[in-house]
């Protein structure tokens, strides 16, 4: 297919249509917009180079852009068995929806504190899983356990009287992680005495 020169002056810079373009919709920066795109909600600036477009701002036929035209939905969660919570910019989350979401998250947090941690990876992870340095997948497990301990230390600083992760138990983890894993220390001690 041979390339041909396009007449850029008569083509809409948004939808690339060249049927409904006229000189009235030309932006001061010389970009053109078709009538269909002109009346749709958009900012009062050129969609290509962001030059201000004063003529459109004063035109009553053009619909004004507001934040309600484009909602950005964010999804939190992502854990198996937990519904995703949707929030949008500019909208407040009512208390009932928030409590509904929190009731699904609370068991995950409590499971962390109760040592019932479940990871979504192909290796079945148990906190008393052997940590031998010559097995490659235990190095991956070692990294996970170290990040758990770092996060547990943060929780202990924020929350008092957490039995599974008391400061005395966490001090044992410091000594444990400063040494390399060996066959002598092949299990991860988690329960407090």
From Swiss-Prot:
InterPro entries tied to this protein: Znf_RING (IPR001841), Znf_RING/FYVE/PHD (IPR013083), Znf_RING_CS (IPR017907)
GO terms for MF: zinc ion binding
Start and end residues, zinc fingers (RING-type): 12-50
Gene3D superfamilies tied to this protein: Zinc/RING finger domain, C3HC4 (zinc finger)
Top-rank taxon: Viruses
SUPFAM superfamilies xref list: RING/U-box
Keyword annotations from UniProtKB, A to Z: Metal-binding, Zinc, Zinc-finger
Protein name per the record: Putative RING finger protein ORF38
Provenance organism: Ostreid herpesvirus 1 (isolate France)
């Amino acid at each position: 297919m041979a390339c041909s020169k396009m007449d850029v002056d008569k083509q809409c810079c948004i939808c690339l249509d060249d049927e409904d373009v006229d000189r009235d919709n030309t932006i001061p920066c010389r970009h053109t917009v078709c009538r269909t795109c002109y009346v749709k909600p958009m900012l009062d600036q050129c969609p290509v180079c962001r030059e201000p477009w004063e003529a459109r701002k004063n035109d009553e036929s053009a619909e004004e852009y507001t934040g309600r035209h484009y909602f950005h939905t964010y999804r939190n969660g992502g854990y198996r068995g937990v519904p995703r919570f949707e929030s949008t910019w500019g909208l407040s989350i009512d208390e009932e929806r928030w409590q509904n979401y929190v009731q699904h998250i609370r068991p995950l947090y409590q499971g962390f504190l109760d040592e019932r941690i479940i990871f979504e990876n192909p290796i079945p992870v148990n906190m008393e899983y052997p940590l031998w340095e010559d097995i490659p997948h235990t190095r991956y497990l070692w990294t996970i356990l170290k990040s758990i301990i770092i996060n547990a230390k943060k929780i202990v600083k924020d929350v008092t009287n957490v039995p599974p992760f008391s400061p005395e138990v966490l001090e044992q983890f410091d000594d444990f992680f400063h040494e390399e894993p060996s066959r002598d220390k092949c299990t991860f001690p988690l329960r407090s005495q």
